[in-house]
Amino acid sequence: MKRTMFSLTLLLILSVALSGCSIVGSRISHALGDEENYIMNEEIITEKVESIDIDWRVGKVAITPWNGEDIVVKEKSDTTLTSRTKMRVRNQDGNLTVEDTAKGVWLLPLLFKKDLEVMVPVGVDLRIVDVKATSSSVYISELSVMDVNIESTSGDIVLDEMKVVGNTSLKSASGKIDADMKAGVTFKAETASGSINTSVSESLTSLDAKSASGSLSIAVKDTERI
């Protein structure tokens, strides 16, 4: 009897949560009135940006250089994007924040994932890059940054040809960490389940790498202090 009541309750919750949703094949998408639907969403930042703060739920996160003049923020999804599920982007006092709004909607993050790409003009020096990801792999390449802080609950972290003048902190609860970079002051990498492979400059004053279940590979480059 208790099992029957639990099943009925679960079905009722799901029916309420999915009301107002359209089902196409095996995909579910929210439709809000006559709102235009998107698969790709893009924001162009023309003002000066000194730091980037990303909070993402599910999908890949990439920060890469490009030859344009402005920072471009793009999200991609194989499921319809609406005002409830599109990212929230704001640039205030040089601090660019990108938030995955779907993370605040119950059940919605379980239905689809979105990939995020932030394209930074070549030659732009950033003060801070801070990324918090839940079920996302994070990839950052060829950027010059003062400090980097990346934290992922479940996903790989990859830094490729990075120049970090100050402090680097990389943490993944479940995922590998690969870092090829010039690091200025401190470097810290930690993963509970996954390998750590890093190549850093010898100018570091502190290096800390920990893996509860995985291999460690640390190479020190013979480079001048940044």
What residue spans do the PLM features occupy?
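N-terminal secretory signal peptides that target proteins for export/translocation
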Residues: 1-2
